[in-house]
Amino acid sequence: MRKRERENPCSICGHYHKYEEGEVCGVCGHCMPVSSDTVAPQQVHVSAFPSEILPEFLYLGSYDNASRSELLKTQGISRVLNTVPMCQNLYRNSFTYHGLDNEKVLQFDDAIKFLDQCEKDKARVLVHCMSGKSRSPAVVVAYLMKRKGWRLAESHQWVKQRRPSTDISPEFYQQLQEFEQGIFGSEMMSAMNINDAPTFGFGFPKIDNQAQAPVFNNAPTSSIFSSPASSIPPQEFTFGATPPKPTTGGDIAMDGS
């Protein structure tokens, strides 16, 4: 194969073969499918190139993308953020690597610190995991929230549009929610509607219909402490069922008014 033909590798597998002519790749066996009505129109091939998230700076991909040094150099990528602790860094002499060493918890702050340095040095960086679907997209989403000031939903949508295969696991998505709370916590609380704030009812249900509450002393009678009618003499008031005892000189008359 002439050198001129080798200047443009296959856009799917990244190797050099006459893919447009239907030649099978001698490295990975890839070949262009034959056009027919039986081929599903929505069928797409995963590109050998990583996805560009931020122009000329941030790229997202899989271990397969990270293993193709020639393609990385074609895109101008010089640094690699490896988010899988057990994943080997293949080209230490050609790229600057940084790895995350926690298998279960994504170290967002550590990753963002490395990406900040890459941006400062104007270096293009690839963030990758094994499949490029969950772990590395979660790290990129965290970076967008931290540095772009975007919320989780907006950052996730941005990444999903540029890498449709993104499928962040529930565990990592929960970590992103906690990371979002740490960034926008005070703003998220202030944005809450005051009507949504809980009321202190001490566990008792709130009575929405006040008409259902019982009403006492609704009769238009006067209070028992109001002045008695003038026709009733004061001495007629008694506090017991027995007749009043006659008063003596030593007794003090009780005022019943």
Curated annotation (Swiss-Prot):
GO CC entries? nucleus
MF terms per GO, please? MAP kinase phosphatase activity; protein tyrosine phosphatase activity
Q: In which tissues is it expressed?
A: Expressed in root tips and vasculature, cotyledons, stems, leaves vasculature and hydathodes, flowers, siliques, and seeds.
Report the EC code(s) recorded for this entry: 3.1.3.48
Catalysed reaction(s) here are: O-phospho-L-tyrosyl-[protein] + H2O = L-tyrosyl-[protein] + phosphate
Q: What happens when the gene is disrupted?
A: Impaired responses to phytohormones such as indole-3-butyric acid, indole-3-acetic acid (auxin), synthetic auxins, auxin transport inhibitors, and abscisic acid (ABA). Plants exhibit long roots and short hypocotyls when grown in the light, with aberrant vascular patterning, increased leaf serration, and reduced accumulation of auxin-inducible genes.
The protein's matches in CDD domains, at most eight in alphabetical order, are given as: DSP_plant_IBR5-like (cd18534)
List the subcellular locations. Nucleus
Pfam families, alphabetized: DSPc (PF00782)
What's this protein's function? Required for the transduction of auxin and abscisic acid (ABA) signaling pathways. Dephosphorylates and inactivates the MAP kinase MPK12.
Q: Which Gene3D superfamilies match?
A: Protein tyrosine phosphatase superfamily
Q: Write out the catalytic residues in the record.
A: C129 (phosphocysteine intermediate)
Q: Name one GO biological process term.
A: regulation of rate of cell growth
> Where is the organism placed in the taxonomic lineage, from the top?
Eukaryota, Viridiplantae, Streptophyta, Embryophyta, Tracheophyta
Q: Which family does it belong to?
A: Belongs to the protein-tyrosine phosphatase family.
Q: What protein name does the entry list?
A: Protein-tyrosine-phosphatase IBR5
What species was this sequence derived from?
A: Arabidopsis thaliana (Mouse-ear cress)
Q: Which residues form the signal peptide?
A: none
List, for all copies, the residue spans of the domain called Tyrosine-protein phosphatase: 49-185
Does the keyword Repeat belong to this entry? Answer: no
